[in-house]
Amino acid sequence: MKTFKGVASAKDMRVAIVGACFNGPIADALVSGAQQTFLDLGGAEDMLTVVRVPGSFEIPCTLKKLLTSGVKYDAIVACGVLIKGETTHYDHIADQVSARISELSLEFNLPITFSVITAPCIDSAWQRAGIKGSNLGISGMKTALEMADLFKKL
């Protein structure tokens, strides 16, 4: 029996981060966490592309643009922050962004991690951005690198 498992190493990996700017300081914490993790795990700055988009809704179309650009990425990390408000806007955006990221990952057979915070309130969002707890940008980058390594082994 063969068992395959990826290792979270950025050495020789070409990775992109697509990060939304909306909900600025929280979104910035996710992108910064992902960037620093890439470097801490042996990645070279010239192998990391960071693209900032206005909001989370713009993440999927930007992912598709990167995926069809001719540059071969090993993985992509999608970072954004959606905080529930009083209308249904949050539900529509969260559902569509999540579904499209998953579809693109399957269509292009590439690890694209979902580091988009979907939180009921700003305090919960901060908890997922590393200020009061874990950082989804960090865990998203680690998962992306582990999956990229696994895909190379399969």
Swiss-Prot record:
Report the superkingdom from the record. Bacteria
Q: What class of enzyme is it?
A: transferase
Question: Could you say which protein family the record assigns here?
Answer: Belongs to the DMRL synthase family.
Xref: InterPro entries:
LS (IPR034964), LS/RS (IPR002180), LS/RS_sf (IPR036467)
State the pathway, as annotated in the record: Cofactor biosynthesis; riboflavin biosynthesis; riboflavin from 2-hydroxy-3-oxobutyl phosphate and 5-amino-6-(D-ribitylamino)uracil: step 1/2
- The residues that the entry says bind (2S)-2-hydroxy-3-oxobutyl phosphate are E86, T87, R128
Q: Which GO terms describe its cellular component?
A: cytosol; riboflavin synthase complex
Tell me the residue numbers annotated for binding 5-amino-6-(D-ribitylamino)uracil: F22, S56, F57, E58, V81, L82, I83, F114
Query: Keyword Transferase on this protein?
Result: yes
List, from the UniProt record, the residues annotated as the active site of this protein. H89 (proton donor)
What protein name applies here?
A: 6,7-dimethyl-8-ribityllumazine synthase
UniProt source species = Chlamydia caviae (strain ATCC VR-813 / DSM 19441 / 03DC25 / GPIC) (Chlamydophila caviae)
What would be an example GO MF term here? 6,7-dimethyl-8-ribityllumazine synthase activity
Task performed by this protein: Catalyzes the formation of 6,7-dimethyl-8-ribityllumazine by condensation of 5-amino-6-(D-ribitylamino)uracil with 3,4-dihydroxy-2-butanone 4-phosphate. This is the penultimate step in the biosynthesis of riboflavin.
Q: What is its EC number?
A: 2.5.1.78
Q: Which reaction does it catalyse?
A: (2S)-2-hydroxy-3-oxobutyl phosphate + 5-amino-6-(D-ribitylamino)uracil = 6,7-dimethyl-8-(1-D-ribityl)lumazine + phosphate + 2 H2O + H(+)
